[in-house]
Regions:
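Sec-dependent signal peptide recognition
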Residues: 1-7
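N-terminal signal peptide c-region/cleavage motif recognized by signal peptidases
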Residues: 13-15
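Acidic/histidine-rich, surface-exposed loop or edge segments in extracytoplasmic proteins
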Residues: 18-20, 63-64
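Catalytic phosphate/metal-binding cores of nucleic-acid and nucleotide-processing enzymes, i.e., regions
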Residues: 20-26
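Residue-level recognition of alpha-helix initiation/capping sites
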Residues: 26-27, 75
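Extended, low-complexity, intrinsically disordered C-terminal regulatory tails
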Residues: 27-57
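Catalytic cores and adjacent binding grooves of peptidoglycan-active enzymes
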Residues: 43, 58-121
Length: 121
């Protein structure tokens, strides 16, 4: 039942992603639900990506094992990010034309500037 509630709260950018959100860890889903309720509507961009690599490093991304999600927040993004940074999750924000938020399993906090080709600057 919780999964159905979770999926109904969030906007998925494609039907294919509807299935992939089910693989996210409960801790990540809980953060998304909290943000959606308290800060603004959450729009999922990406969850599971087979063979995903971290830009500029070649290391395996948390997305490759469905341990991370990229999303937009409809409003109050800065307040939501401040709250997320106080939580025990990985949080990455992006600039340089990519303005989504990344949340994953882990504790890393950062901000990256990535160009349209996925290369860090």
């Amino acid at each position: 039942m919780k999964r159905l509630i979770f999926l109904s709260l969030l906007t998925l950018s494609s039907p294919a992603q509807a299935a992939s959100t089910s693989c996210l860890p409960a801790s990540v889903k809980a953060k998304l639900n909290y943000i959606d309720k308290h800060f603004g509507h959450v729009i999922i961009i990406s969850t599971y990506r087979k063979n995903a690599r971290i830009a500029g490093s070649g290391k395996r991304s948390l997305h490759a094992s469905c341990q991370a999600v990229d999303f937009h927040i409809a409003r109050n993004k800065s307040a939501a990010v401040r709250w997320l940074r106080s939580q025990p999750v990985e949080v990455i924000t992006y600039g340089c034309g990519m303005h989504h938020v990344h949340v994953g399993v882990g504790s890393y906090k950062g901000h990256h500037c990535v160009n349209s080709k996925g290369v860090r600057r």
